[in-house]
């Protein structure tokens, strides 16, 4: 391990009180490459990938390009704010063909910052249905109102069932 890995571990410890090993850091040449690898690692051909719309277009494009099916959980626009339809989310997560949830936190393109309670609800639902959470937290540094809750640092279960990415 090198200077960069030590700095990343130290930063997560200070910012989120979350500890992990330097050996758990893996590099990818791009977000698209890393996402494609994760989709192939955690799903089967023809399997479903849960995601929330509106969504960053590469999420759907890469899912389809890798022979998987997009399972869309639309965010509802209510009183000027995007809200999660947890009933629909759980129904989709319970589908035996679904094994991966692509979480964008904060959400891109809406800018929605999920609360720790909402993230914990995602974790509970996904853990109950053996769905891995891939948490794209690349925009976590751009939260201007409220506070970013770091998914893997929320609980042991969250750390166990999630993979996260940042740059």
Where are these regions (language model features)?
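Conserved core of the PLP fold type I
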Residues: 1-124, 141-142, 147-158, 162-163
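Walker B beta-strand of ABC/ABC-like P-loop ATPase nucleotide-binding domains
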Residues: 102, 133-134
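Conserved donor-binding loops in enzymes that form glycosidic bonds
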Residues: 166
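Walker B catalytic acidic pair
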Residues: 137
């Amino acid at each position: 391990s090198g200077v960069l890995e030590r700095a990343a571990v130290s930063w997560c410890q200070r910012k989120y009180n979350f500890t992990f090993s330097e050996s758990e850091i893996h590099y990818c040449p791009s977000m698209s490459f890393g996402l494609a690898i994760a989709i192939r690692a955690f799903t089967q051909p023809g399997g479903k990938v849960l995601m929330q719309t509106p969504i960053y277009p590469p999420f759907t494009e890469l899912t389809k390009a890798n022979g998987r099916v997009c399972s869309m959980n639309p965010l509802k626009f209510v009183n000027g704010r995007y809200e999660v339809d947890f009933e629909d989310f759980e129904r989709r997560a319970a589908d035996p063909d679904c094994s991966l949830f692509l979480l964008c936190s904060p959400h891109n393109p809406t800018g929605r910052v999920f609360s720790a309670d909402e993230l914990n609800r995602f974790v509970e639902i996904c853990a109950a249905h053996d769905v891995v959470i891939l948490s794209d937290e690349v925009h976590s540094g751009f939260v201007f109102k409220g506070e970013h809750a770091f998914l893997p640092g929320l609980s042991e279960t969250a750390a166990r069932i999630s993979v996260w990415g940042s740059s």
